[in-house]
Amino acid sequence: MCLPRPASTDAVGVRTALLESRLCTVFPLRFDDLEAMQGAYKSASIDDFMDMIQPHFHALDASAAPLSLTTKAGPAAARMAAAPPWLRRLTECIARYRTVTVHDTLSHPIAMLLVVSSSGPDPLNAFAQLYEASKHAADTDILRCYLVLHDTATAGSDVSRSLALLDEVKRTYGLQCALLPINSGAGAGTVAADLLAAEWAAPDLRRAPHASGPTWPGALLSTEDIARLRTFVRELVTKSLVPYLERNEQRLNEQVVSLRRGLANRLLGAGRKLFTARPPSPGYDAERDEYPPASVTAQTRRLADLAFHVRDYRLAAQMYDAVRRDAVTDHATTYAAAAGEMLLLTRAAMAPAASDLDALLCAVCEEYAAIPGGRLRLLRAAVLYSNVQRQTPRYESVAHALLRGALSADEVMRGVLLEGAARAYLGLPRPHARKSAGLLLQAAAQYELCAQKTLARACLGALAAYYDTCAWPALHDHVLFHLARLAHASGEISEALTFLVRLVHPAPLAETAQHMDELCEVAKYADTLRCELPTPMWIAAACQIKKASEWPRTAQKGA
């Protein structure tokens, strides 16, 4: 298939379990190959994630709004507080990289699209094989849609055979079937291929990047093919996926309410003591740390995910909270943390100004930190929560979340999060310049360790301008010295000398010696050495020429 992996459909109407209508301005989708989904059923560590995203950060530059720690609150501060490109890139990578686990059922696929070409030798048998393969890769009640592809480049424009195949597929598998003609373009380099290039340019962290040239996806598509693709995606959402989600949410809502009411009645009948300190709920397997799919907690989590998909945030928050309380009682830390993460995001989407959201974030991060391999999930929860709060915007919560994520990050990722927190502090009604400066110092040091010289110099340049106006000479000298070293490492000798010359002033002996040694080292490589010291070495008005006979006698004896 030539569907873009991250796709979306605009203006989709959904209906909640209480029959309330909602309009989704954007209904996002993600298409993954079956092999990629099967390979994702393993816990990924933060080291694996860093190895995957490292190539995407080689081309980072300082193209964001320049930092100024002295800017007052207003539009300029809001522009600086906006997420820089490298933080947006990190957020996109984290959002796309969601491993499939039993504890986080939101990562499970909600539908399966089985695609077979009508030009194959036995299309019906191919559908049967795909159906059997999909039974082991998804939930039992998943939506399955069947798509017959008519490849115009190989089968011609006559679709009679494909239509006959479509009728046979409908009789066998039901009405969730469609026919899609593709590849009617003239060849590679068409306008249609260029239209899809931007959608395929987004990095897919589960697969190797596609090569350019005639093998580029969509090379034979025409503009009519692209229009048919987009129409198919919209009909898939509005006529198949959304009705499936709505039906299952209503059905599960009735089941879960009945099950939980019956469980509560049994517990209350046994007495208050049993209700307040009950044993693990039936169905929880403590040895495998797993809730069976038929258990009350698993069904509640499934209902919460369905409600989240149809934007029924109130019901989703109630169900995530119930799952979290069950998991905490059963000492299922991984389930509790996963439900807490979704409860955090759901409540932030409902009421971003709630006072207890930051406390909930801290609790979720502590639970993830206690789980083996939970650092990546901690990072994802913090970054996604900060992204939700940035839309409000609530910059103090954004900074708090990014700092929590930086505690579990390494290398360039930590620098990105620290700089994002520093920028967020500048967006407050009363910008916290000192906090921002301290975080920028840490971010610059982290960038320097990771050889991200451009980003480090951008942070240090803002700090140098800020400390010029403050009475902190030691910090100012520290920033200038590191700017000089970065300029020297980049081969900009004259700029390095400019920074080092500003360090020639009265200072402690150890620091002065270090600065002078660096100045002498850099001066060796200067083509022309012309620099003006901040303090002149010779003050002509205060100099006198005296004969030796005019010296004091004590000076003559010493000589």
Language-model-detected regions and their locations in the chain:
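Eukaryotic intrinsically disordered, low-complexity segments enriched for acidic and Ser/Thr/Pro residues
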Residues: 1-282, 433, 438-440, 453, ...
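Extended alpha-helical assembly domains of large eukaryotic scaffold proteins
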Residues: 261, 265, 269, 273-558
